[in-house]
Curated annotation (Swiss-Prot):
InterPro entries membership: DAC_DacZ, DacZ_N, Diadenylate_Cyclase_DacZ, DisA, DNA_integrity_DisA_N_sf, DNA_integrity_scan_DisA_N
Similarity comment: Belongs to the adenylate cyclase family. DacZ subfamily.
UniProt cross-references to HAMAP family, sorted A to Z: DacZ
Top-level taxon: Archaea
Keywords, ordered alphabetically: ATP-binding, Manganese, Nucleotide-binding, Nucleotidyltransferase, Transferase
Catalytic reaction annotation: 2 ATP = 3',3'-c-di-AMP + 2 diphosphate
Gene name per UniProt: dacZ
Pfam family, one: DAC
Enzyme class: transferase
Effect of disrupting the coding gene: It was not possible to obtain a strain in which the dacZ gene was deleted in standard growth conditions, indicating that dacZ is an essential gene.
Protein induction: Is constantly expressed at different growth phases in rich and selective media.
GO MF annotations in UniProt: adenylate cyclase activity; ATP binding; diadenylate cyclase activity; manganese ion binding
Protein name: Diadenylate cyclase
Cofactor: Mn(2+)
Length: 269
């Protein structure tokens, strides 16, 4: 019987890269003997792989896990559009147990990896806020389109560069994004003016904030309005991330460092 390494080599012989998702040391060693460039995608590089992409979040959905890992590899110029890769992922827990062939396409570079992996706030918090915006984009408020602005991270500086538009319903509360009840509250309050301010750890610091950063020199695409300009500007003056849902076109956009890093249709997410 052929050695396991030979069988594995045959399976991945014609691909441009082999992506191992969260492998154990023994599992990694089995693939390390193949001639195909191997990339480990995991929360930490515990196997000391030469080529590594951080996976800061756990994705239950295998498709989402692969998409996120591939985009991270594209960000690091490990792969490019046109490459074919083999993704070794786990579907039943434990070590990776399935092999999925993926052709890398340019449209896989959505900005989601940068949003989740490279923001100041906890990646799970960023994802929770992003998913609230996505759901609002899909369903709106009582079937009607709605806009919303979420400023995540560096909450102290954001509060110093903004002022209240109305009573802050979260002033003395200790509620966090990600809680289903809190998410419903966010959706309800999104009908009103102003931004939500959310801490690095996900605490809802305030609603109804009028952002007052200077907009000078902020580069946002033409056609976007005051909500996007305010979101872009506050991320230039602070280390926050802005997630914006447009009422007019229904798209979700994210800003960091004064620049737009993501634009996505909620229906395509």
């Amino acid at each position: 019987m052929a050695a396991l390494s030979e069988l594995l080599g045959d399976l991945v012989a014609d691909v441009d890269g082999l992506f191992l998702f969260t492998p154990s040391s023994s599992h990694y060693e089995q693939f390390a003997e193949t001639d195909v460039p191997t990339v480990v995608i995991a929360p930490e590089n515990t196997v000391e792989a030469e080529t590594f992409v951080e996976l800061p979040l756990q994705f239950q959905n295998v498709k989402d896990r692969i998409r996120f890992g591939v985009e991270g590899a594209m960000e690091q110029s490990i792969v490019e559009a046109g490459d074919t890769i083999a993704c070794n992922v786990g579907t039943f827990g434990g070590d990776p147990d399935s092999l999925v062939r993926v052709r890398v396409e340019e449209n896989m570079r959505s900005g989601i990896y940068d949003l989740f992996a490279n923001s100041r706030a906890d990646p799970g918090v960023i994802r929770d806020v992003f998913e609230v915006a996505i759901e609002l984009g899909k369903k709106g408020q009582k079937g009607e389109p709605v806009g919303a602005l979420f400023i995540v991270g560096d909450a102290g500086k954001v509060m110093n560069k903004s002022r209240p538009l109305s009573y802050n319903p979260f002033e003395k509360s200790h509620v966090y994004v990600g809680d289903p009840i809190v998410n419903v509250m966010l959706k309800e309050f999104s009908r009103l003016d102003g931004a939500f301010v959310i801490s690095d750890s996900g605490k809802i610091v305030s609603a109804y904030r009028y952002l007052e950063p200077s907009a000078e020199g902020v580069d946002i695409p033409k056609g976007l309005g005051a909500r996007h300009m305010a979101g872009g500007a506050i991320t230039r003056d602070t280390n926050a991330t802005a997630i914006v849902l447009s009422e007019s076109d229904g798209l979700v956009r994210a800003f960091k460092g004064g620049k737009m890093i993501l634009e996505i249709d909620p229906e395509a997410y």
